[in-house]
Curated annotation (Swiss-Prot):
Annotated localization: Secreted
Top-rank lineage group of the source organism: Eukaryota
GO cellular component term of the entry, any: extracellular region
One example of a Gene Ontology biological process annotation: defense response
Function: Antimicrobial peptide.
Name recorded for this polypeptide: Xenoposin precursor fragment BM3
């Protein structure tokens, strides 16, 4: 459903954000 899709998108964004915080390009 749309809820799981939103959760997936937020999870991806959070993962990317954390990686950028830990290892800034």
């Amino acid at each position: 459903g749309w809820a799981s899709k939103i959760a997936q998108t937020l999870g991806k964004m959070a993962k990317v954000g954390l990686q950028e915080l830990i290892q800034p390009k």
